[in-house]
Amino acid sequence: MQERKAAVNRDTLETQISVALNLDGTGAAAFATGVPFLEHMMDQIARHGMIDLDVRCQGDTHIDDHHSVEDIGITIGQAMHQAVGDKRGIRRYGHAYVPLDEALSRVVIDFSGRPGLEMHIPFTQKRIGSFDTELFWEFFQGFVNHAGVTLHIDCLRGHNAHHQIETVFKAFGRALRMALEVDPRMGNAMPSTKGTL
């Protein structure tokens, strides 16, 4: 099977980003983004998705984190799209429930080629430390638009905002792992009756 790796650079007047990933990795991660809480969350994607993920960003964080967070989501989405290739042989769909103490989240993903995001997280705080929780929407919307996936995110319960979003990212990683897994029974077939995704 062809290696499922990608490296993408994205340069704008607001951010300069590089992302390298390996879908068949061991969960190794390295980050230098200037946004520490997002790095903590991306580490969950790598660890629970068994994806090697390296993300570097120089952004205008002296203004705020918005551009960096959104553009990192975009660039990871572009790299994911490139690494997946034509999607032959993958399971395509993935889902996971993940708890953390009182919090519980569900994430469902479809590598359909159709970008779509439904995200429902009733955050109990507007900020986690200095991080604005509204930016998680920007991260996932950027990812979805450029990975070409349908993504449903629901935090079902929780009263600690850190726990709420950590369960989301852990479930996201596990759903990715399931969807991207190669199904030996599929052979080289496309996981769609249309014959294309």
Swiss-Prot record:
It comes from the Bacteria. Its EC number is 4.2.1.19. Pathway: Amino-acid biosynthesis; L-histidine biosynthesis; L-histidine from 5-phospho-alpha-D-ribose 1-diphosphate: step 6/9. GO terms for biological process: L-histidine biosynthetic process. InterPro entries: IGPD_sf, ImidazoleglycerolP_deHydtase, ImidazoleglycerP_deHydtase_CS, Ribosomal_Su5_D2-typ_SF. It is found in: Cytoplasm. GO terms for molecular function: imidazoleglycerol-phosphate dehydratase activity. It holds the Pfam family IGPD. Keywords: Amino-acid biosynthesis, Cytoplasm, Histidine biosynthesis, Lyase. GO terms for cellular component: cytoplasm. It catalyses: D-erythro-1-(imidazol-4-yl)glycerol 3-phosphate = 3-(imidazol-4-yl)-2-oxopropyl phosphate + H2O. Its main location: cytoplasm. Belongs to the imidazoleglycerol-phosphate dehydratase family. This is Imidazoleglycerol-phosphate dehydratase. It comes from Teredinibacter turnerae (strain ATCC 39867 / T7901).
